[in-house]
Amino acid sequence: MSARGGSLHGRVAFVTGAARAQGRSHAVRLAREGADIVALDICAPVSGSVTYPPATSEDLGETVRAVEAEGRKVLAREVDIRDDAELRRLVADGVEQFGRLDIVVANAGVLGWGRLWELTDEQWETVIGVNLTGTWRTLRATVPAMIDAGNGGSIVVVSSSAGLKATPGNGHYAASKHALVALTNTLAIELGEFGIRVNSIHPYSVDTPMIEPEAMIQTFAKHPGYVHSFPPMPLQPKGFMTPDEISDVVVWLAGDGSGALSGNQIPVDKGALKY
């Protein structure tokens, strides 16, 4: 259970894609530091082009239980970040319940595989629609509440290592994650006058349902040269990172200890991007 004197005590965090994996980890870790949580996830299939299983209502319920186990309050709802009206309604309800909004973790995203010229319209539009447009809609819905609260705050945009380098075999994903860098850096300038910081993080090889090892193996078997764009991590040559390791960085960026940082791209990759 979180201590009353946690580093984020009295603050409120809005976390997308919160039903499982990174999103749940971020929500729970922020709660452990004293923040109350607004948690959302679609809890349904995003598109027929996304081949791994979606999060479920039961997953979101488990996030709620985990946050409450930390002694914090949580407002959870099944919302598609592509749905502007539902996002705005949730933000309004969160502010009404908790009185403020201080932290946004724009975490929700989807991944797919395919060479750029072989992608279907549905594959392209789903990934861009969720990862880029959905993130923009999230920020458009939450930023006014942060400004109105007048407390400054921190926005963490969850991009990817694919937002900093080429990733053959999922160029639509890389395009969406690169675009988040421009979104992050522009917003960092625009929100500076309000004391709101905006940074992006770029995780690499995290153990979540999105990884789809079989899809990766099939892609590399068909196109062996692509494997060079997915090197092992120098600090951890085998296996994947855990969501909790990414949450270490999210919690730090949410708090005052990172107060000098805004408009930064932070690789969370155990050195892999240095190859």
From Swiss-Prot:
- Where does the record place the catalytic residues? Y173
What is the protein's given name? Uncharacterized NAD-dependent oxidoreductase MT0715
What SUPFAM superfamilies does this protein map onto?
NAD(P)-binding Rossmann-fold domains (SSF51735)
Key word NADP present in the record? no
Keyword terms:
NAD, Oxidoreductase
**Gene Ontology MF terms in the entry:** oxidoreductase activity
What species is given as this protein's source? Mycobacterium tuberculosis (strain CDC 1551 / Oshkosh)
Family in the record: Belongs to the short-chain dehydrogenases/reductases (SDR) family.
Where along the chain is NAD(+) bound? R20, A21, Q22, D41, I42, D80, I81, N107, K177, V206, D207, T208
Q: Which residues are listed for substrate binding in this entry?
A: S160
Q: So what EC number does this one have? A: 1.-.-.-
Source organism superkingdom? Bacteria
InterPro entries in the record, alphabetically? NAD(P)-bd_dom_sf (IPR036291), Sc_DH/Rdtase_CS (IPR020904), SDR_fam (IPR002347), SDR_subfam_1 (IPR023985)
Q: What PROSITE patterns does UniProt report for this protein, alphabetically?
A: ADH_SHORT (PS00061)
